[in-house]
UniProtKB/Swiss-Prot annotation:
Residues annotated to bind S-adenosyl-L-methionine: L78, G109, L128, S129, P130, L131, T132, L133
GO cellular component: cytoplasm
Protein name: Ribosomal RNA large subunit methyltransferase H
Intracellular or extracellular location(s): Cytoplasm
Main location: cytoplasm
Organism field: Psychrobacter sp. (strain PRwf-1)
Phylogenetic classification of the source organism: Bacteria, Pseudomonadati, Pseudomonadota, Gammaproteobacteria, Moraxellales
Catalytic reactions on record: pseudouridine(1915) in 23S rRNA + S-adenosyl-L-methionine = N(3)-methylpseudouridine(1915) in 23S rRNA + S-adenosyl-L-homocysteine + H(+)
Family annotation (InterPro entries): Alpha/beta_knot_MTases (IPR029028), RlmH-like (IPR003742), tRNA_m1G_MTases_N (IPR029026)
Amino acid sequence: MKLRILSVGSKMPKWIDTGFNEYHKRIQPMLTTEMVDLAAAKRAKNPSEANLAQYREQEGKAILATHQSNSREKLWVLDVKGKMLSTEQLADKLSEAMQVGDDVALVIGGADGVSPEVLAAADFKWSLSPLTLPHPLVRVVLMEQLYRAMSINNNHPYHRGN
């Protein structure tokens, strides 16, 4: 299984890159992962709701163009209205995808969310938390949770949950 993280935005603070890279390095023996940075739409200073919809549409087109929909790559989208999973449930979901031979493209949308087209194309909508998290921090939290889930699946002692 290969997991690609499609993330809108780039030029993360050094501490974000450091945290992300630490878990990215740790997970590689268990799961091949790749970060794909997608350009964020250029934003106006005081955008209208119509502008925000345009940004989501532009970023959504980039996400869908990058997603390998003609392959076995499933599209998982982070969305505040998505299904919340425990770490153990995430481990099960990753295990299921591996067993059937699916690859996964996991989407971190832009600062204004994801387009309706991306949500409609999603095979799974996942909510990391009901909290509003800073966009860059999601990268670190996501990679740590993926590593923790894969540690469970590989009987690695990192996860000490129940």
